[in-house]
Amino acid sequence: MRMSLKSLYILLLPAVMLAVAACTKPTAFGEGLLSSEIADYAFTDTLTLRCTVEQEDSLLSSDRSSTASYFLCGQLQDPFFGVSNADIYSLLQLSNASPNFTDATLDSAVLYLRFSLAGFYGDTTVPQTIRIFQLDEQLRWDSDYYSNQRLTTGTEIGKLENFLPKPSTLYNAFDTSANAAKAAYIAVPITQDFGNFLLDIDSIDMTADSLFWKKLRGIRISATPANAPGAMMALNLNDINFSFLRLYYKRDTLVRFFDYEFLGCNKFTNFTHDYSGSDAGQAIGQNTLDYLYLQGMGGLRLKVEIPYADQLDDVIVNKAELVLTTAARSGDNALLKPANQLVFTELRGDTSLVLTSDVLYAIGPTLSGSFVNFGGFPITEKDTGGNNIQRYRMTLTQRFQNMVDDTPGNIKNKTLYINIYPQRIAPARAILFGPQHPDHPIKLELKYTRL
C-alpha cells in the first residue's frame, strides 16, 4: 500500500518533536527528516474572516432528569444588549404520597429557593422583586421544553418585594445545630388562598404525582430589578434541602408541615431578549463590523467564515488559533463582565449546532474535562504598545486542517460558530473588536508546514 506524503508526515511528527527536544544545538523544525519534502515552517495571520452576528435559535432547557446545577431568573438592562429576561417554569411534587390533611387548618405557606453563586451575573446591590404564579396551562412531566416556550399563567400566588439577593450569605433556619449544612436562600411568602387550595385537594389526587399535577399544573418564577442594570439570579431548584414549598398547618392543636419538592420534576427556563435600539441589535445580520457581540442564554452567537482556507494547498496545520480581543466601550457597566468561556460549534445537518472536534478533544466525550488545551477563556496579554488587553484564544487546528483539505466552494465546511458556554446557564456577554478594527481585529493565527 502506498502511503501519502501527508500521512507519512503525520506518522513521523511525534518522532520529529522528540528529536528536536533532544538536540543540544537548535535546528530548524524537522531538519534531517523528510528534508526533500518539507519546504518551510510558516506563519500567517492575514487570512480573510467574514463575521456575522446572529441571534441564537431556541435551546433545549428542560430538566426532566433533575441534573441542572441551577436555573437563571431575573432581568438584565444592558447598555449595549438591551433587556433580557429569564423566567422559570416548574412542576412541584409531593414529598410523600397521601398526606393527611383531615381537619387541618392553614397556618402559612413559604417557597424556599436556594441561590447558586456561580450563576449570578450583574448587580446584586440592586433590590429585586420575585413573583410566583400558578400555571393555567399544564406543564407536562413527560415533554421537553425549549427556551422560547411560554406557558399561560394565572393568579399570582406569592411575592417577595425589594430584597437584596445575597448569594454568599450562608445560613440554615431549618436546622440550627452546629454541624448543620448551610446555604444561601430566600423565603417567598405564599398567599393564604393558595395554601388553602393545596389543603383542599382531594386525598385521591394526592396518591400519585401524575394525579396531583392535574390539580397543580405548575408554577412560574419571575423576578424584576428596581433599576438598571439588574441581575440574573441563579436558583438551584434541585437542592432538596433548601428548595421546596413548605405548607405549615395545624391539626390536633399541633403545627405541622408538608413539603412540595422541585427535585424529580420537569422544569425549564424561558428567555426573552429585546434588542430594540441597542448596539448589539443593530449589529445582527451585519458582516462588516468594528465590534462583535456575543451573549449567553437565548442571546447572540457569532458566525465566522474562512472562505479561502482551501487555497492553502499541500500544508500540514501545526496550530490554528482564533484570537479575539475584548472591547472596553464608553458607557458600559463594569459589573457586566466578559463571558468566562467561549466555544466553537458547527452545523450538523441544517439546524443543529454541535461542538467542534477541537473542543471535544479538550473536554472529552462526557464534556467534563478542562478547556485548557482548547482555550476560549479570557486572558490578559500585552499589545504592541505594552498595554494590558484581554483576549480569547480558541484552538481550531483539527477543524482548520479539514477546511484546508476540503474542495473549493463548500462554504458550509469553512464556517464555524462561536457561542458562550454553557449557553442555557450562562447569563454573561462579550463585546469584541471586529475584523475592521485598526489595532485589534479578530484574526486567525496559523502555523503550518508546507510539503
Feature locations, PLM:
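Secreted, disulfide-rich extracellular signaling modules
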Residues: R2-A15, V20-L451
